[in-house]
Amino acid sequence: MALKDTGSGGSTILPISEMVSASSSPGAPLAAAPGPCAPSPFPEVVELNVGGQVYVTKHSTLLSVPDSTLASMFSPSSPRGGARRRGDLPRDSRARFFIDRDGFLFRYVLDYLRDKQLALPEHFPEKERLLREAEFFQLTDLVKLLSPKVTKQNSLNDECCQSDLEDNVSQGSSDALLLRGAAAGAPSGSGAHGVSGVVGGGSAPDKRSGFLTLGYRGSYTTVRDNQADAKFRRVARIMVCGRIALAKEVFGDTLNESRDPDRQPEKYTSRFYLKFTYLEQAFDRLSEAGFHMVACNSSGTAAFVNQYRDDKIWSSYTEYIFFRPPQKIVSPKQEHEDRKRDKVTDKGSESGTSCNELSTSSCDSHSEASTPQDNPANTQQAAAHQPNTLTLDRPSRKAPVQWMPPPDKRRNSELFQSLISKSRETNLSKKKVCEKLSVEEEMKKCIQDFKKIHIPDCFPERKRQWQSELLQKYGL
């Protein structure tokens, strides 16, 4: 900055750009009209005040993109820049050109104007706002560079740096391999078709499946010096490694994320740990979420010579690896068919059970006069049309149904009599159990039981002294 005398005793503050232009042409006026070979009304070094942030750049840098907003503002040949001149552009109190935009994001716009390349820091959270700034300054190529990345961020809720894209590619390939392995290991049937539909259909993989690893460094500590044998497990911290979405789903608020904050849910981390130190509590949470342990390993930690203590000797590092398989994806139509099939199986098993309870007789009605010996042709025809009878044990829904050959048929009159006799016997037994004896009857029963006790007149001689003393005491 410098002071310029106006001749009337006052002075004005000049920016660096005015000093450069004044030193290059000291005798020329500042607002001279540009002729065909007249110099540019803008200085070679331009000072900008963008949203309170001061930037100093070359005039040629602002004109590097011809169709941009900055080129139209600072180009002397454009209607906006040449006709209005630099005196018409807004300035701040220090005579710097003022642009009312985001001053923090303008540094990336200015970097792009210098070399036409976009270099953003890792985990940059302002991509959408930077896209708006690029659209305002009419930087078409910069908009094209930012648009697919913002779309990727919106669709996957992911950051689009190069390392993040590699993480997404590796994650997608691992999910595809996982689903292929599940499809190869599944038996032929509805389960295999469900998995193959997910892999071949190109739909999104199951985000609920995946691995979680728990690791901890455990040691044993003694209670007191005189109780050296009493050692107890001591766990300083339980580390959690795996996909962030799975870890948050299982552990929730008990997960400490201070060591690796601001990570997207679909990313992986190895820096989370739990707020509690009880392994069994972590196992319970994983079991409730559907995880099961697939592998574990442990190794001892070596101690230095000068730190040869019990807590260093009795220490180890252990890892437990848990896995939750992908869930079976069933269409509504297939689910409806499975329910109908299950209902039919239940009805068949119930009818088979009822037939077996009825003395394993036939469910078809026959007249009393007809017997298997009288008409063997009718018997064979009825046996051909009658389904086999189910066993008493109700089969599971997915297990094959076991059939038994039809039993010999009896007359309905005999069946009716057997049913009546059975019902009477069950009613009598229930009544006997449900009856309660009165107090008088209980006393009579006790007296009768006491009378049944038989005391011998004489007891054999006992060799032991205490036995003979006991008999003499009671005069037996």
UniProtKB/Swiss-Prot annotation:
<protein>
    <recommendedName>
        <fullName>BTB/POZ domain-containing protein KCTD8</fullName>
    </recommendedName>
</protein>
<keyword id="KW-0770">Synapse</keyword>
<keyword id="KW-0472">Membrane</keyword>
<dbReference type="GO" id="GO:0042734">
    <property type="term" value="C:presynaptic membrane"/>
</dbReference>
<comment type="function">
    <text>Auxiliary subunit of GABA-B receptors that determine the pharmacology and kinetics of the receptor response. Increases agonist potency and markedly alter the G-protein signaling of the receptors by accelerating onset and promoting desensitization.</text>
</comment>
<comment type="subunit">
    <text>Interacts as a tetramer with GABBR1 and GABBR2.</text>
</comment>
<dbReference type="Pfam" id="PF02214">
    <property type="entry name" value="BTB_2"/>
</dbReference>
<feature type="modified residue" description="Omega-N-methylarginine">
    <location>
        <position position="80"/>
    </location>
</feature>
<dbReference type="Pfam" id="PF23110">
    <property type="entry name" value="H1_KCTD8_12_16"/>
</dbReference>
<feature type="region of interest" description="Disordered">
    <location>
        <begin position="331"/>
        <end position="412"/>
    </location>
</feature>
<keyword id="KW-0488">Methylation</keyword>
<keyword id="KW-1003">Cell membrane</keyword>
<dbReference type="GO" id="GO:0048787">
    <property type="term" value="C:presynaptic active zone membrane"/>
</dbReference>
<dbReference type="InterPro" id="IPR003131">
    <property type="entry name" value="T1-type_BTB"/>
</dbReference>
<dbReference type="InterPro" id="IPR000210">
    <property type="entry name" value="BTB/POZ_dom"/>
</dbReference>
<dbReference type="InterPro" id="IPR011333">
    <property type="entry name" value="SKP1/BTB/POZ_sf"/>
</dbReference>
<feature type="compositionally biased region" description="Basic and acidic residues">
    <location>
        <begin position="333"/>
        <end position="349"/>
    </location>
</feature>
<dbReference type="GO" id="GO:0098794">
    <property type="term" value="C:postsynapse"/>
</dbReference>
<dbReference type="GO" id="GO:0043235">
    <property type="term" value="C:receptor complex"/>
</dbReference>
<feature type="modified residue" description="Phosphoserine">
    <location>
        <position position="413"/>
    </location>
</feature>
<keyword id="KW-0628">Postsynaptic cell membrane</keyword>
<dbReference type="GO" id="GO:0045211">
    <property type="term" value="C:postsynaptic membrane"/>
</dbReference>
<feature type="modified residue" description="Phosphoserine">
    <location>
        <position position="78"/>
    </location>
</feature>
<dbReference type="GO" id="GO:0051260">
    <property type="term" value="P:protein homooligomerization"/>
</dbReference>
<feature type="domain" description="BTB">
    <location>
        <begin position="44"/>
        <end position="122"/>
    </location>
</feature>
<dbReference type="GO" id="GO:0008277">
    <property type="term" value="P:regulation of G protein-coupled receptor signaling pathway"/>
</dbReference>
<keyword id="KW-0966">Cell projection</keyword>
<dbReference type="GO" id="GO:0042995">
    <property type="term" value="C:cell projection"/>
</dbReference>
<keyword id="KW-0597">Phosphoprotein</keyword>
<dbReference type="InterPro" id="IPR049904">
    <property type="entry name" value="H1_KCTD8"/>
</dbReference>
<feature type="compositionally biased region" description="Polar residues">
    <location>
        <begin position="350"/>
        <end position="391"/>
    </location>
</feature>
